[in-house]
Amino acid sequence: MKNTTSQNGFTLIELIIVMVILGIMAAVAVPRYLDSIENAEASAEDAVISSIRAGLKQAANDSLYTNGRASWPTNPFHALAEEVAGYTTNNTLADVDGEWTFFSAEGQTKISHQRADNSRYTWDYDEGTQVGDAAAVGALGERVMVTPAP
């Protein structure tokens, strides 16, 4: 009579080694994944702001052609051919993921956007002065992170 033993499965050491390797891979992959999400959101914001800048230039050219004076609209989103996804007209700081707003507060006008991680960013907007000899086309500032109130 033959006595054969079959060994099916993995040893405890092999399973532990696999778990350690998976843990190392996860420790490296998760931060890279989170960085790629943040970079994607920043790129999407840059695309929207670039579209707004191009729309403002076109609006200034159109205004110059019709009125003889280059001017920007009061609301920069009105310079776009198509409405931005997530744009709302509630005149407050964006407070919903993916929301874009234009608002006036304390004498300042700003564009705001909230990302999926609940971080908020703003861009200062000045439509410029269109009166008398002091006429000047406006300005659109750089991205600034809004620090949450404590």
Regions found by a protein language model. Name each.
Residues S112-P150:
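Short, surface-exposed interaction loops/tails
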Residues M1-F10:
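N-terminal leader/signal peptides at the extreme start of proteins
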Residues A40-T66:
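Membrane-proximal N-terminal amphipathic helix
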Residues I16-R32:
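Alpha-helical hydrophobic helix detector
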Residues Q7, M25-V28, A40-S43:
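Residue-level signal for short amphipathic helical patches enriched in basic/charged
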Residues N61-S119:
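Extracellular/periplasmic head regions of type IV pilus-like filament subunits
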